[in-house]
A protein has these predicted regions:
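A short alpha->loop->secondary-structure connector
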Residues: 38-48
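Short secondary-structure boundary/capping segments
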Residues: 35-40, 167-168
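Amide-donor transfer/coupling interface in amidating biosynthetic enzymes
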Residues: 49-184
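Catalytic nucleophile loop
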Residues: 14-35
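Single conserved hydrophobic/aromatic residue that forms the stacking wall/gate
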Residues: 1-9
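A structural motif corresponding to the C-terminal end of an alpha-helix
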Residues: 10-19, 144-147
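The start of beta-strands in P-loop NTPase/AAA+ ATPase cores
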Residues: 5, 18-20, 150
Length: 184
């Protein structure tokens, strides 16, 4: 995606066509390594750039987690309930969001922290039972400054009428419905 041709295509999609980009799990890893989140453009990472790294427990995790929608600034989250808690599957070994305190404060101030890992009461937490990878400030997903690029670790796409029927909680963040609505 750093090649000139791909960069031109990406620029046309995001800038000229007012498009959207979504990265879930490994897609989030790609977006953050490219700089599309948090910067909104492809640029090299610096030593202090936010990144995703190995889970704090040092191994792969696969389970259902609670995430809270912190902002619906992103078109991807327009139909999600602001402050709503969703039960989302995760499955990753390198999903821990790491950034300096200054970066995290900036992301919160800009409304770029989209979702956070929370406990059963909807409170962001560092408890590894709920924040399974040890993400700083319990951050599960972030956006570009304009919100049109969203990266998140939880698999919001893994929903359906016959999927995880024995799991309590709302599983539909309406991400794809929101994305379609954006273009209407």
């Amino acid at each position: 995606l750093r090649r000139q041709r791909q960069m031109c295509i990406r620029d046309r999609l995001l800038n000229e066509r007012d498009g959207l980009a979504l990265g879930i799990c490994n897609g989030f890893q790609a977006l953050i390594k490219l700089g599309l989140v948090p910067y909104g453009e492809i640029r090299p990472q610096t030593d202090d750039s936010p990144t995703l790294t190995m889970n704090s427990i040092g191994r792969h995790q696969s389970k259902m987690v609670y995430t809270k929608v912190v902002t619906n600034k992103s078109p991807w989250l327009k139909k999600a309930e602001l402050g709503g808690v969703y039960t989302i599957p995760i499955s990753h070994g390198e999903g821990r969001f790491v950034a300096s305190k200054e970066w995290c404060e900036k992301l919160f101030a800009n409304g770029q922290v989209a979702t956070q890992y929370v406990d059963m009461n909807g409170n962001p937490t560092m408890d590894e039972y709920y924040n399974v990878n040890g993400s700083y400030y319990a951050i599960e997903g972030i956006t570009s400054p304009d919100g049109r690029v969203l990266g998140k670790m939880g698999h919001s796409e893994r929903i359906g009428q016959a999927v995880a029927v024995n799991v309590y909680g709302d599983q539909n963040q309406k991400i794809f419905e929101s994305g379609v609505e954006y273009f209407k």
